[in-house]
Amino acid sequence: MKNLVKLLTVLFVGFVLSACTKNKAELGTAENPIKLHFVPSVDSKVIEDNSKIFKDYLEKNTSYKFEVTIPQSYIAVVESFGTKRADIAAINTFGYLIAHEKYGVEALMTVLRHGSATYQSMFVAKADGNIKKIEDLVGKKVAFVDPASTTGYIIPLKSLKDKKVEPKETVFAQKHDNVVSMVYQGQVDAGAAFYSPAFKNDKGVMEIEDARRLVLTQYPDVEKKIAIIGLSEPVPNDPFVFRKEMSAEMKTKIVDAMMTFVATPEGKEAFKAIYGVTELKKATDKDYDVVREMLKTVGKNASDLMKK
């Protein structure tokens, strides 16, 4: 019996020492890899396949070891920083504001899409109507997307408040394409939805990238029939964020490697497939102060908008 107790004691001590050794392993080693989180805004298999290419590149060019995880939601990513299960993550703007406030997470890069580091909202109305600018929406019926939609409500709401414009009635269409359809069909006087600038395709033809493109099949003449009457102020794109306890040297090496990767042909293809990203740009927390001020203006907080 005594021998059994001794054996169990030895095994227990060995287990504890092993666990402690693992916990003390330096970040970036095989025993304690840097945990990189990608939220599945597209098919998880697409992220899994392309993030492996990204992971292999980082390991080859930084000497660190990485582990890629695909959480189920932005909130899960935020809380992973609190439990130290995340070191780096691609996260949306509101998720970053929460993670920064609660856990000191740092935004070190922002994504670019077609050369733009920001995104905007737009107001649209019938091109042949009397509504030509945002100020003309006083006393009108306006469609928004959803109370928790950034480009479909929060940002355009700030635009209205800044100009002291009060519509007579507001409705929520639930989707960006529904907003455009309601304006096209005359169900509302105007609507607010996401805006991205038009770009030149491979054939040299300009293509619209705003919410109107979502109904091109249904309404081929939507670009002519529905006009943009105003744009919101620019808001910074989603950031790549880092846990604050990571060393400055480690952060610098990884940021440099990530920006180099996105500039390669395989990097461009991988990031475009994952998030429609074409480039990365260095960022700081101050870049997101405009979002904080926007939320104050409309009486919202980031936590409210992350519930949906």
Language-model features: where?
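C-terminal motif of bacterial Sec signal peptides marking the signal peptidase cleavage site
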Residues: 16-19
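Bacterial signal peptide processing site
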Residues: 21-23
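Extracytoplasmic small-molecule ligand-binding "clamshell" domains
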Residues: 26-93
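An extracytoplasmic/periplasmic, membrane-proximal ligand-sensing/linker region
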Residues: 31-53, 59, 208, 246-308
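Periplasmic-binding protein-like
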Residues: 35-40, 114-122, 213-244, 252-255, ...
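A conserved helix-loop-strand patch within extracytoplasmic ligand-binding domains
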Residues: 111-165
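Pocket-lining segment of extracytoplasmic ligand-binding domains
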Residues: 141-249
